[in-house]
């Protein structure tokens, strides 16, 4: 049987090789070996995702590669999630995050990973899905009173809709009741600052860390 370091290395490899089946296999192997799921995700899957992200930034890989890597990571996380849910039921929620992919954008993989990581970190996550109308984000803030509302955009053409969330939350009189987070491949800190978003999630790990910091949890 492989030791912990080998299993974690294999988890990273599954992501950098865009291998869904290997990611699932490694996740099952890790659970059987009693490896902490959070450690597997952070040192294995996320480390692999960060490597893919760096290569994408350097022009060595392209968006389909990033999506394939994210798909593999999602496959692994799905295996681990039931175990994480079991643990989470024994601890107090850190807060509620409503998250969705912005209107006009059918890509959900990045949003799915961030949602999974927030869930694992101890937040109650309300997944609004993909191609979510702006008014749905606003209505969910009024209805659920989450601490954070997050929108993901994978295209520059849909990214502009994130401005509408900020504006419509203000019009509805609830902007000061919630933190807003934006993320996605074309999204930057400059963009978040420009539109007035509270949090920019560069990666899933970054999003979790910044949500925790923003809420002081």
UniProtKB/Swiss-Prot annotation:
Induction: Induced by growth on trimethylamine but not methanol or monomethylamine. Part of the mtbC-mttB-mttC and mtbC-mttB-mttC-mttP-mtbB1 operons. The keyword NADP does not apply. It comes from the Archaea. One of its GO terms (cellular component) is cytosol. It holds the Pfam family B12-binding. Keywords: Cobalt, Metal-binding, Methanogenesis, Repeat. CDD domains: corrinoid_protein_B12-BD. SUPFAM superfamilies: Cobalamin (vitamin B12)-binding domain, Methionine synthase domain. Methylcob(III)alamin binds at residue 107. Gene3D superfamilies: Cobalamin-binding domain, Methionine synthase domain. The keyword Endoplasmic reticulum does not apply. InterPro entries: Cbl-bd_cap (IPR003759), Cobalamin-bd (IPR006158), Cobalamin-bd_sf (IPR036724), Corrinoid_p (IPR012741), Met_Synthase/Corrinoid (IPR050554), Meth_synthase_dom (IPR036594). GO terms for biological process: homocysteine metabolic process; methanogenesis; tetrahydrofolate metabolic process. Residues 1-92 form the B12-binding N-terminal domain. SMART domains: B12-binding_2. Pathway: One-carbon metabolism; methanogenesis from trimethylamine. Residues 94-217 form the B12-binding domain. Belongs to the methylamine corrinoid protein family. Can form a complex with MttB. NCBIfam families: pyl_corrinoid. This is Trimethylamine corrinoid protein. The gene is mttC.
